[in-house]
UniProtKB/Swiss-Prot annotation:
Keyword Membrane in record: no
EC numbers on record: 6.2.1.5
Source organism of the structure: Pelobacter propionicus (strain DSM 2379 / NBRC 103807 / OttBd1)
Protein name: Succinate--CoA ligase [ADP-forming] subunit beta
Subunit structure, interactors included: Heterotetramer of two alpha and two beta subunits.
Entry keywords, A to Z: ATP-binding, Ligase, Magnesium, Metal-binding, Nucleotide-binding, Tricarboxylic acid cycle
Pathway it works in: Carbohydrate metabolism; tricarboxylic acid cycle; succinate from succinyl-CoA (ligase route): step 1/1
Binding, Mg(2+): 198, 212
Gene Ontology MF, one: ATP binding
GO biological process: succinyl-CoA metabolic process; tricarboxylic acid cycle
Cofactor dependency: Mg(2+)
């Protein structure tokens, strides 16, 4: 789960980490008022669920409240395109207006979950700012990575070694040690999968300030934090992903034309690979889970059909706990009810597979049966390559 920068900064401030003075604004007049309260000279930052805002023109400096208001009018309501949003961009509905900070140095600091080691990692670099991705790609030796032992946690000596590695000495080093330990405490107490400060700046006055921050929460821990749903900005999410979440479906929108419905995350990832190998481009990742009902399968299929980029659908099911006849009934309910004319290829195996296939054959829908995963992928790709289909009305 993602949140905005201003929300992440409020959380960090609660753990004793210094942040710039700032105000959140929803319109130009609020931006002008915030700029006036901050002394006129201020930074205006678009709030979207993506990084790279500086390169996309989403972070601007205003010299006075009037200019701040004009910048707000330029940003609000527009789609901000960054290297992380894709070409469609994300709509700007909120702005963070902050004081200007005199910066002496920019550092990078984050703690994130390393999927390979299944442990948290402390990542630090003496070269923070907008180009940290380029540094990671071209000069990885400039980035320090410490894997944290989950049994003993992050220790003071490790935080001090990291601070010294950033070139900090004396009182500034001790301040950084405290900041790193507080960042780790925040990570654990708030069930984060990532906390990132970029840049962490050393001011001309000799203080450490979190100028920009990113925070994501572990979705599996959301039940422990009843306040988290109130932090979500649904305007930043794909409507289909929101609809899928209501039915406890794992859905991620992709850029292709072949809708995918699969049971099991591992099989879903393998399905995407097989489609790519066959020359197709998947339009989504959708996992209905291991014991979905007929109604849940139908809703999952309807979500796929609502995506206007989808020109065909590939269903890949292994029936263990899941019954193939229930999958077939759900597909038929959704496809026949919506008047869908898209080509559909279904590959299924396992529990009640013959009953499921028989239901599909007798449905009267444009459905083909794949003998195996590879055959199913090749069939749907071939059908899309030679047919021009009418859009599905769902």
């Amino acid at each position: 789960m993602k949140i905005h920068e201003y929300q992440a900064k409020d959380i960090l401030a609660g753990f004793g980490i210094a942040i710039p003075r700032g105000r959140v604004a929803m319109n130009a007049s609020q931006v002008e008022r915030a700029a006036r309260e901050l002394g006129g000279h201020c930074v205006i930052k678009a709030q979207v669920y993506a990084g790279g805002r500086g390169k996309g023109g989403g972070i601007r400096v205003a010299q006075d409240p009037g200019q701040a208001g004009e910048i707000a009018k330029e940003l609000l309501g527009t789609k901000l395109v960054t290297p992380q949003t894709g070409p469609e961009g994300l709509e700007v509905r909120r702005l963070l207006v902050e004081e200007v900070v005199d910066i002496e140095r920019e550092l990078y600091l984050s703690i994130t979950l390393d999927r390979e080691s299944s442990r948290y990692c402390l990542i630090a670099s003496a070269e923070g700012g907008m180009d940290i991705e380029e540094i990671a790609r071209t000069a990885p030796d400039r980035i320090r990575i410490l894997t944290i032992d989950p049994f003993i946690g992050l220790r003071s000596y490790q935080a001090r070694r990291t601070a010294l590695g950033l070139g900090l000495v004396g009182p500034l080093c001790e301040e950084c040690v405290e900041l790193i330990l507080n960042l780790y405490r925040c990570l654990l107490e708030r069930d984060c999968s990532l906390v990132e400060i970029n840049p962490l700046v050393v001011t001309n006055a000799g203080w450490l300030v979190a100028m920009d921050t990113k925070m994501t929460f572990d979705d599996n821990a959301l039940q422990r934090h009843c306040e988290y749903p109130d932090l979500v900005d649904y305007s930043q999410l794909n409507p289909l992903e929101i609809a899928a979440a209501r039915f406890d479906l794992s859905y991620i929108k992709l850029s292709g034309a072949i809708g995918c419905m699969v049971n099991g995350a591992g099989l879903a990832m393998a399905t995407l690979d097989v489609l790519k190998e066959a020359g197709g481009e998947p339009a989504n990742f959708l996992d209905v889970g291991g014991g979905a009902s007929r109604e849940k399968v139908a809703e999952a299929f309807r979500i796929i059909l609502q995506d206007r980029d989808v020109r065909g659908v590939f269903v890949n099911i292994f029936g263990g706990i899941m019954r193939c006849d229930i999958i077939a009934q759900g597909i038929i309910d959704a496809a026949s009810g919506g008047g869908c004319r898209l080509p559909i290829v279904v590959r299924m195996d396992g529990n009640r597979v013959e009953e499921g296939k028989q239901l599909l054959r007798e449905s009267g829908l444009n459905i083909r049966i794949g003998e195996n995963m590879g055959d199913g992928a090749q069939q749907i790709v071939a059908m899309l390559n030679r047919e021009v289909n009418q859009p599905c009305q769902s």
